Each structure stands twice: as C-alpha cells, then as structure tokens.
Amino acid sequence: VRIRIIKFLSGIFIAIIFLFGVGILVLPYLVSTDMIRIRLAQELSAWTGYNVQLRDPPRLNLFPYPKALLSGVTLASRMDGVAPLMEAESIEVDLSVVDLFRGRVSFSETRIVHPQFVMEKPVKTMADFFDRFSRSQGALGLAIREAREILQHNPENPEIDHLLKQPFGRVVIENGALVYQDSFSGVAEKITGLNATFDWPESTEEVRLRADARWRGEFTKLSIDASQALLLLAGGKSQIKASLNSVRGGITFTGQARLSEYYIFDGKVSMRSPGWNQTLSWVAGKQFWGHKFKIPIVWESHFLARPMHIQMNNVTFTMGKTNARGALELDFQDHVPNVIGSLAFDNLDFSFFRPVFFSVKEKNPFFQTEIFNHIGVDIRLSAPQAKLSNITLTNLAVAIQIRNGHCIFDLGHANILGGSLQSNIEITPAGQKLWLEGRASGTAIDMQIVLEVLGITPFLQSRANFTMILRTLANSWSGIFAKMRGELALSMSSGRLLGYDLNDLQRRLAKNEQFFLMNDNTLSTAFERWNIQTSFSDGTTKITESLMRTEDWSLSMWGTIASAIMQDWQDKLTLQAKLQKNNSSETLCRDVQCLANSLMQPLTFSLNSKGQNRGNFWVKQDDDAN
C-alpha cells in the first residue's frame, strides 16, 4: 500500500511538472505582444491623459517571473508644439501568471528605466502642480474632478468610499532625470540619478512615495506619505508626512494638509541645518538674506500655514550652542515678509549675526542695509546672559523693528559693565550712506571696566551715570566716528583718580611754571564728585565742563580734542585747567578756613599730551595766572 501511495504521488508531481513546462512553452503563443503593447499604452494614457508612443514592440520574458519589456516609450501632450512629458529608455512591467493563462494582461508593478521628465513651465505653487493632473482627460483627472464635486457638497467630512476604486499599483523609477524651470530665476535646472518607488494600491487608499536623486550637486532623499491622496489632489484635507533631507539640511512636516489655492498646513515641522549658509546656497543660491550665516541650526515648532500667513508656536531651536524658545508669525504685505514674535534665549552671542548684517569691502566691514527694504521685523528678544564682542550682558531685553527701510534697535534693559544700560538706535539708509541716530543712558556703570574694555589702562575707579545722544551720516565705520555729532554727560558721585595726586600737583604748580607730569601707580586722589559734559562734532571732542571735587580741591578742565575716539585721545589732548581750594568765597567767609582758602589764588594751567606716552602730560601755567 505504501509503495502504491508513493507511486501515485510521484505521478502527480511529474504530471504537474509536465503541465507547467508545457504551459511555459505555449504561454508566449497565448499572449500576444500586441495585446501587451496596447494594454500598456491604454493604461498609461488613461491615467495621465497623455498620448503614449511605443517605439518597438514589447519583449516577453518568463524567467524568473513573467515580465514585459518595452523600449523607447514617450508620453506626449495631445497639443502640438509641447515638449514630451516623459521619454524613457524602457519600461518593464510584471505580469500576472494567472491572467496570462486566461489570455488577459494585468500589471502588478511597473519599472521605468532611464526616463527623462520635462516640466516645460515653472510651477509657481503646489496647487498649480496638482491642478495639471486634474485637467487631464485620463482616469486620474476624472477621479480628481469627482472627488472635488464631493468636497463641494461636504468639505469637512467627504465620503469617497463609493467612488470607483481605480487600481494603480506600484511604479518604480530607475536612474531617471527631471528637467524643470526654477520659479525664482526662470533658469532650467536638472535633477539626475532619480530613483523612486510610488505605491498607490487604489485611488481611495494611502499613497507612499520614496525617492532619492542628485539635486544641485547633493544626494537628496524625499519621503511622502498621504492617508487620503485623492482628496489631497482634489483640494481636500489629508494627514501627511513629508521629509526632504541631504547633507546640506533637512525638513520634516507631520500633520494635516490641504493643497489648493487656499492651502493649509497644520502640524509639526522639524528642520536641521549644518550651517545656514550651506542650506541657503543649496536651496536658493545667494539670492536670499542670511546666506553668510554659518551657524548650525536645529528647529522644531507647531506650524500653521495659510495663504500669506504662517504661524509658529511652541518654537524650540538650537543655534550653535544657544537654545531658544518662543513664538513667531510671518505674513506678507505687498509681497514683503513681516516677522512678528518673541524669542527667549538661554544665552546669546551677537557675534553670530555679524556675517548677516555686515559686508566686507576692501577690508572695511559695514552694515548691509539692502535687507531693510525686503523684510519687516518686529521681534522681542530676551536672554539671562548675552555677549557682545568681549562684553558680557545679563538680563537682556531687546526689541528689533524693521519696516519700510527703517530699522530701530531698542535695548529696553541690560546689566552691563557692572551697571545697567538702556538705548534706542534708529538706522535709515540714505542712498549709499547710512543715517544713524541714537540715545543711550546708563546707571552705575563701572568706569574701570569700561576703560579695560576700550583697551586703556584704567586711571579711574568709580561708578558713573551717563546719558548720550549721537547722530551721524556715513558709509563706513570710520566715517561714523569722523562725522558723528552728539553730547555725552557723565556723573560720578565718588571714586578715585589713579596715578595722580592733586596735593602734589598743587605743590609743583606753586614752584614751577612748567613741568612734566607722569602717571605714578603709587599715587591716587579720592574725589567726592566728578561731572563731565562733552560734545562731539566732525571728528573732534569738546569738553565743555569737567569738574572734580575732592575733600580739599576743585579741579576744572575744558578744551577740544582732535578725535572722537577715546583710544586716540592720548597724543591729542590739549586742555585748560583750574585748580582751587574748596570752601572759599570771593565775597564773604563765615569761618577761618574759608578765609584761609580764599587767600590762595586759583591755579590755571594747561595739559598737553602731544608726543607723550599714555598718562603723561606737559604742564604749563598760564601767563596771566595770579
């Protein structure tokens, strides 16, 4: 019995092999290559609405699985004089074995080898891109138009289940190219090495696209998943996840989208850039502002985009080693983007922004004002700690406004140089020059730190309150100081003058008409109050009043300095001075000390630093001194 069973099964197995072999042999005779050619042409034409041209008859391969190979395939517009949408070296289609035995042709997967796609006109918007499909006379265009009719009746809860479920399957593109026109420059560009897999089982189901190519010199990956692709193409809403990545940067959006004239993107966006300059040069060349900004950026936020308006909440981003949180809005007025919002940094280094606002021309960096006419800004910045060159700031609160070519930088508060500072600076382009007007005030500023920051050996220990007003019109940084006009008032309640002793100065003035006054680190003078009033104009500084009061003396100085830059004052100082005793009177004294002090005549003299080392002066009494 066992032997009979084995013989029976062996016979069945041999029969199956025989029938399979016979089927393979007769299969090419059952399937007409013309049938494959016609069916493929019908399918492509029905879906795209384009005419399909096949240069050669298809070839049928049965091993390792049935497939048809067509060479020289062209998708051409039905309008004369329009470039073909696609020209492919070959198209391979996987065939269903069951349908082949029935004498029918059905495709499970289509591979397009070495195609070149041509988009003759620039696509201005995503809606414009998909609108081209909806206008086609193929099955895809018909399905999109039917979905649009459903959306018109019930835009919030469209029911597309009853639509005819058009099979689409899988399309694979191998080593293709795409030629298109850049929407900004109008120049034709080419994407090469295009490999893509497009999965869309049926028109009412989810779409999955995976693609990679070389775009603008970089290997780039694109990924798109849409849960309701047909609704999306028809202008409805769909859940979508899309990402674009390369070594130059990447962006991912996850959320709900509607691609129409009144588009909407509502979800989460994540962006990374190894260097903002690298990302901009890759995406848009050097035609956008900020292309010199080299800091790496990582960004995440909720993202809501509508026509002419973008809102980003719950912003968290990293810029170099700086982290920030906040909210931003972007809208457009007369095609000019306007950014509004606030950002809170954990620390901020203003040197990051130097390449953005400053250009270098013949080793003379200056402010770039072109951006003022191309963007509007109203942003509040805050940071518990910030850095400006080698100056540290804490509790920073800043407002920046740019509108109609006019920039306002408002420093609401900052702890700086041991005290606090407020300032307001307005910048307005004037042809090739820059009009700058500013006001600043400070409280309890440590003058010793100020001098150290300026690179000057400290000759003063005190805290000062100050107010400053300045105005200038210039086309370079050196021109700002050369043409600057304004006033500066300093008020110090107490402190110490380092390197000099007024008692020693009085004794030397009493004995000599002229002498050399040197800075001596062992000497100092404590003062009770020191008020200074200065003005500057056309590269010169005028000290209108400088009154220092010590316990015993009052020292007044005035004069003009041929420089508006404090670091250059050393060899340009020529000041007049008067030294006199305190508690004196020219009329009536009420005590003996006042009487004694009044009998001492004030000493008037000049201080000249020309040709001297820093801190040294040539002192000469006035000829008419009493």
Describe these PLM feature segments:
Residues Y50-N51, M79-L95, F184-T197, R216-D225, ...:
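Amphipathic hydrophobic-ligand
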Residues Y50-N51, G72-F198, A284, L330-D334, ...:
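Secondary-structure transition motifs
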Residues S136-F265, F366-I402:
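Elongated, acidic membrane-bridging lipid-handling scaffolds
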Residues K237-A242, H309-T316, S382-P384, H406-G412, ...:
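Transmembrane beta-strand segments that form the barrel wall of outer-membrane beta-barrel proteins
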Residues V1-I14, A305, I310, V315-M319, ...:
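Extended terminal
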Residues S45-G72:
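Short extracytoplasmic
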Residues V1-G49:
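N-terminal type II signal-anchor transmembrane helix
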